[in-house]
């Protein structure tokens, strides 16, 4: 997802939501946000009527790229987008097998 291309996420001043989040939330909060977005789109991929698997997977990948950039920009880790997608795909797989509270 090109955040600058998706103008439906901009306010009346043209500021993108993604830029607002980066300015107003700390590193840990942003990691949580991006992780949940990747997880959401991986779980949803191929299930939402009118949305292809590929479209949702690409959205997950775009958020994973943002997460990798965030981590690398903060020089805390050196994760690749593939690392992140693999890790969060594992979470999505766990969710698909989860039967709820046991």
Q: Which residue stretches match the model-derived regions?
A:
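Intrinsically disordered, low-complexity regulatory regions
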Residues: 1-102
């Amino acid at each position: 997802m090109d955040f600058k291309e998706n103008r439906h996420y901009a306010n009346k001043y043209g500021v993108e939501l993604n830029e607002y989040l980066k300015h107003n939330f700390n590193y840990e909060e942003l990691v949580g946000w991006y992780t949940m977005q990747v997880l959401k789109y991986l779980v949803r991929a191929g299930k939402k009527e009118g949305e292809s698997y590929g479209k949702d997977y690409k959205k997950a990948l775009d958020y994973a790229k943002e997460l990798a950039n965030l981590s690398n920009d903060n020089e805390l880790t050196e994760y690749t987008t593939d690392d992140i997608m693999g890790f969060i795909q594992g979470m999505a797989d766990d969710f698909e097998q989860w039967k709820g509270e046991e």
